[in-house]
Swiss-Prot record:
Protein residues bound to Mg(2+) 2: E299, N301
Catalytic activity field: hydrogencarbonate + L-glutamine + 2 ATP + H2O = carbamoyl phosphate + L-glutamate + 2 ADP + phosphate + 2 H(+)
Positions bound to Mn(2+) 4: E835, N837
Record gene name: carB
Enzyme Commission number, as recorded: 6.3.4.16, 6.3.5.5
Residues that bind Mg(2+) 1: Q285, E299
Protein name: Carbamoyl phosphate synthase large chain
Lineage, uppermost ranks: Bacteria, Pseudomonadati, Pseudomonadota, Betaproteobacteria, Neisseriales
């Protein structure tokens, strides 16, 4: 039956900011859904608070709202736009929960809006643990023994029934938030308390543990005529007990017999029928007992998920696009498969003739206090995917795509006790310890006994270790064509072979080239080569026939950013996608190289050709050899491609845009200093030190406090503010490895300076400022973690003009062609240059959304030789409204990690708020970031000596709004002396009742807590920040943040909603 004609406009709810458990896979699904529905003639209205997404680009939907995703805001949008239906299955758990809130609060009934894609009942049945269990029993499928609980007493009674270890799963959360595995009563009580808080319905499932069972997932699509297809079966390398988002996964499933596969296939179709998903995609998770084959259902997601993004990329079947069309009434047989050029219908089940491996990427180095053991609560921040013709090839390609310094199964330890520990308690590198165990002489049976990973997977790694041993016993010239080809087919990189042979990677590469041994490229075609495909979606392997068939058009190759991590996230993918779109429009053939399955850049129709490959020198050079591009762009994927720039130039690759030499001039301290001196610009006093003694001497020359860091970093890794020689000594000994080649940088720290970010674009002749952003948090907080406002909310016009002048001077001096970002600090009216990055920065998407100028597209065209004049981009656009970007943090996933912000970046994502005043925009950004300010209660202030004066204004603002003020002794005394009425409250060490009690009792509406840097005061006040985090009370660890919130709260009762299209239209008419 064709599409529904009774629906004219559809509202899509996005997933909001990137958090652990919900990353950019929902930008990919949302963008696909927008395209699919507009193709069919529907008016699409979109709401999403995350500006760094492709889906919030003004051309993706008819009307786009970058607004907080909460039912109250969405109700305003519904009242304004009057959609006929809402599609809630494209925005992860955020969108589902928002849709349920709209239904429960009567909004859908009031405006007569229908939920499509999943009914309220189907969402509830799948997400409510108790109802789901009943539904499974009804169709004869077993679930683990479990009980639904709403109180601690019920939970304790349930625990006695299921025994230890016990699994705790909260309802209506994602990424296993709040859940965990308890091995004793203390752990059980702690996890339950956390879980009740995390579940919006205050409900937990207490479940029997099936640790060590094998875990599988099925990606299923079903239409309203009950046509069902399995897109892909996925098998977890890690057994049950590790969240599937933190597990290494393989597709298709490798260790099922055909009979077992058919049983699981039938079960997953039965689950969809019973839950009532009849218009879209779902994923169903199973566990199988390896001892006797018993199969149980773990859970299902009635929506597009992280796994469906993986399944889409693994097979080439666009699940989100198909699901969106099914939601408006199409059936699978009516839709065509794009990859085969329409030769097959969408009801044709994909089959694949290769193996896909996904490995998660973690960021524990950012959270030294966090527990890095993997459990049922998700902790990874990104993932990498690789394809090969064998499991060994795809596994080794995925390892080197992770960008954690691996080039294969690099050794981690020779200590048998440590290896045993790592196998038994899964951590982020367990697969490497499996390899170490084989090297150390463990047998396959022993390893399986300790870690419960399937013997078939273990045998694959064992075989690779035998190969490694044989290679390291020989010399390079022993490897003839046949021997080297055999190793390459098993996925060994040149670099890993070089390590084993004790030679350089270049020598291995030259030896391989001399033997004329190169990979071929195979196409992803959804049908295992049954039909020919025009779609150039390619992966490398060492076989006979190459299917790449390159054209002879003028081509530009764009290197992507690889797996998401803290410091390099979706913002860089956004820039890569824009480069591909712009250059395609300008008549170039575009080639994308990337290995992140969550992103829009790895969608097969974003660029003309997609190579799904690791971003290593070896892999990139082979693609260049095959495609022979006119130019390569390395400036848009963050640090990943920049690291390859010099080596690519050495190998004769034409890098377009800003030259590798200019990038080096900006990143190399001594060269950059010379550029600034020549221009007469100021930097904070700084020095370079190559060892500890030198650092201590030079520190005295500049004076404390200092910012110290290693050279060449992104996301402020291992950066610290130190206040004394003792702290500096500790840093030099514990945090960094210093040498002649990698010195440590010392900068004088500008206290209480205002930090400013500027993005600009240049074609080599003209420079246009994209936007000037004033940071909310003072200098010293990493720019990626700081809120910022465009236009600036308190900088004078003179200072802004001086910043413009300096930015342009540096762009000319460095010969920038494309984008450039500068960070300034302004102290007492003096402008200092902190750093310059002649590349795309993480603020580019935000600036583009705020000003309506697509900077990344403009920059890419400049690189390809199209001038700013020709593009009609000649002057800076300054909005007549305020846009505020705010960072979003993962602290709730890492109990015990302190929330104090500093120079090391720790945010995973961002949101944007738009308003007529700075206050309104800031308040909306806080709502978007998940902060909820209670209308009643007290404001708690506890600040260090130098912040007391600044906090007076904050206290007065909140008092006017009717809040009571309470503070710790010193702060209270100071505020009382300045005419405020303040209640004094005990710090935790001072006896009860103390601030911790007040937070637990719900008396506190907001916390402003700043501390001096000495470890004692940090640890004394740690409990305040932890309690605030657990009680979900908004907290600010800078006075600037607290003050901005006090301004913002004034406008909370009259917040407007503005579409991007109306805002940009206003700016166009004004200019």
């Amino acid at each position: 039956m064709p599409k529904r004609t009774d629906l004219k406009s559809i509202l899509i709810i996005g997933a909001g900011p990137i958090v652990i458990g919900q990353a950019c896979e929902f930008d990919y699904s949302g963008a696909q859904a927008c395209k699919a529905l507009r193709e069919e003639g529907y008016k699409v209205i979109l709401v999403n608070s995350n500006p760094a997404t492709i889906m919030t680009d003004p051309e993706m939907a008819d009307v786009t709202y970058i607004e907080p995703i909460m039912w109250q805001t969405v109700e305003k949008i519904i009242a304004k736009e009057r959609p006929d239906a809402i599609l809630p299955t494209m925005g992860g758990q955020t969108a589902l929960n928002c849709a349920l809130d709209l239904a429960r609060n009567g909004v859908l009934a009031k405006y007569n809006v229908e939920l499509i894609g999943a009914t309220e009942d189907a969402i509830d049945k799948a997400e409510d643990r108790g109802r789901f269990k009943e539904a499974m029993e009804k169709i004869g499928l077993s679930c683990p023994k479990s009980f639904v609980c709403h109180t601690m007493n019920e939970a304790l009674a349930a625990q006695e029934q299921v025994g230890f270890p016990t699994l705790i799963r909260p309802s209506f959360t994602m990424g296993g938030s709040g859940g965990g595995i308890a091995y004793n009563k203390d752990e059980f009580l702690a996890i339950c308390e956390r879980g009740f808080d995390a579940s919006p319905t205050h409900e937990l499932l207490i479940e029997q543990s099936v640790l060590g069972w094998k875990e599988y997932e099925m990606e299923v699509v079903r239409d309203k005529n009950d046509n069902c297809i399995i897109i892909c079966s996925i098998e977890n390398f890690d057994p049950m007990g590790v969240h599937t988002g933190d597990s290494i996964t393989v597709a298709p499933a490798q260790t099922l017999t055909d009979k077992e596969y058919q049983i699981m296939r039938n079960a997953s179709l039965a689950v969809l029928r019973e839950i009532g998903v009849d218009t879209g995609g779902s994923n169903v998770q199973f566990a199988v007992n390896p001892a006797n084959g018993e199969m149980i259902v773990i859970e299902m997601n009635p929506r597009v998920s992280r796994s469906s993004a993986l399944a889409s990329k693994a097979t080439g079947f666009p699940i989100a696009k198909v699901a969106a069309k099914l939601a408006v009434g199409f059936t699978l047989d009516e839709l065509r498969n794009d990859i085969t050029g329409g030769k097959t219908p969408a009801s044709f089940e994909p089959s694949i003739d290769y193996v896909v491996t996904k490995i998660p990427r973690f960021a524990f180095e950012k959270f030294p206090a966090a527990d890095d053991r993997l459990t049922t609560q998700m902790k990874s921040v990104g993932e990498v995917m690789a394809m090969g013709r064998t499991i060994q090839e795809s596994f080794q390609k995925a390892l080197r795509g992770l960008e954690t310094g691996l080039c294969g199964f690099n050794p981690r330890s020779e200590d048998k006790a440590e290896i045993r520990r790592e196998l038994a308690n899964p951590g982020p590198e367990r697969m490497l310890f499996v390899a170490d165990a084989f090297r150390a002489g463990f047998t396959l049976e022993e390893i399986h006994e300790i870690c419960a990973i399937d013997p078939w997977f273990l045998a694959q790694i064992e075989d690779l270790m035998k190969e490694e041993k044989a290679v390291s016993d020989g010399i390079l010239s022993d490897l003839d064509f046949a021997a080297l080809r055999r190793l390459k087919r098993k996925g060994f990189s040149d670099k890993r072979l070089a390590q084993l042979l004790n030679v350089s990677e270049k020598e291995v590469r030259e030896h391989r080239y001399a033997l004329k041994l190169h990979p071929v490229y195979k196409r992803v075609d959804t049908c295992a080569a049954e039909f020919a495909t025009e779609t150039a979606y390619l992966y490398s392997t060492y076989e006979e026939e190459c299917e790449s068939r390159p054209s002879d058009r003028k081509k530009v190759m764009i290197l992507g950013g690889g797996p998401n991590r803290i410091g390099q996230g979706i913002e860089f993918d956004y820039c890569c996608v824009h480069a591909a779109l712009a250059l395609r429009e300008s008549g170039f053939e575009t080639i994308m190289v990337n290995c992140n399955p969550e992103t829009v850049s790895t969608d097969f129709d974003t660029s003309d050709r997609l190579y799904f490959e690791p971003l290593t020198l070896e892999d990139v050079l082979e693609i260049v050899r095959t495609e022979n591009p006119w130019g390569v762009i390395v400036h848009y994927g963050g640090q990943t491609p920049l690291k390859l720039a010099n080596a690519l130039v050495e190998n004769g690759v034409n890098i377009i845009g800003t030259s590798a030499d200019s990038i080096d001039a900006a990143e190399d301290r001594e060269r950059f200093q010379k550029v600034l001196n020549d221009l007469g610009l100021r930097q904070p006093p700084n020095r370079i030190a190559h060892n500890e003694e030198e650092a201590l001497v030079k520190a005295e020359e500049i004076g404390y406090p200092l910012v110290v860091r290693p050279s060449y970093v992104l996301g402020g890794r291992a950066m610290q503010v130190v206040h004394s020689a003792e702290e500096l000594q500790k840093y030099m000994r514990e945090a960094v490895q210093v040498s002649e080649d990698s010195p440590v940088l010392l900068d004088f720290f500008l206290n209480n300076a205002i930090e400013v970010d500027v993005d600009c674009v240049s074609d080599g002749k003209d420079v246009v400022i994209g936007g000037i952003m004033q940071h909310v948090e003072q200098a010293g907080i990493h720019s990626g973690d700081s809120g910022c406002s465009l236009p600036p909310y308190s900088l004078s016009e003179e200072i802004q003009d001086e910043i413009r002048r300096q930015t342009k001077a540096m762009a000319y001096a460095l010969g920038v062609v494309g984008l450039m970002n500068v960070q300034f600090a302004v102290q007492d009216g003096v402008v200092f240059v902190l750093e310059v990055n002649p590349r795309a920065s993480r603020t580019v998407p935000f600036v583009s959304k705020a000003t309506g100028v697509p900077l990344a597209k403009v920059g890419a065209r400049c690189m390809a030789g199209i001038s700013l004049k020709e593009q009609g981009v000649e002057k800076e656009v300054v909005p007549d409204f305020y846009a505020v970007k705010e960072a979003v943090f993962p602290f709730i996933k890492f109990p015990g990690v302190d929330t104090i912000l500093g120079p090391e970046m720790r945010s995973t994502g961002e949101v944007m708020g738009v308003g007529a005043s700075f206050g309104e925009a800031y308040y909306k950004a806080q709502l978007g970031a998940g902060e909820r300010l209670n209308p009643t209660g007290k404001i708690f202030l506890s600040v260090r000596e130098e912040d007391k004066e600044r906090v007076i204004k904050t206290a007065k603002n909140f008092q006017v709004l009717g809040y009571g003020i309470c503070a710790t002794r010193g702060t209270a005394q100071y505020l009382t002396e300045h005419g405020l009425i303040v209640q004094t409250i005990n710090k935790v060490p001072e006896g009860r009742p103390h601030i911790g009690d007040a937070l637990k009792n719900g008396e506190i509406a907001l916390v402003v807590n700043t501390v001096s840097s000495d470890p004692q005061s940090v640890s004394d006040s740690h409990i305040i920040r932890q309690s605030a985090l657990q009680q979900r009370v908004p907290q600010y660890t800078t006075t600037a943040g607290g003050e901005a919130m006090s301004e913002g709260a004034k406008s909370r009762d009259h917040l407007g909603v503005y579409s991007v299209q109306e805002l940009h239209g206003r700016l166009k008419n004004r200019n």
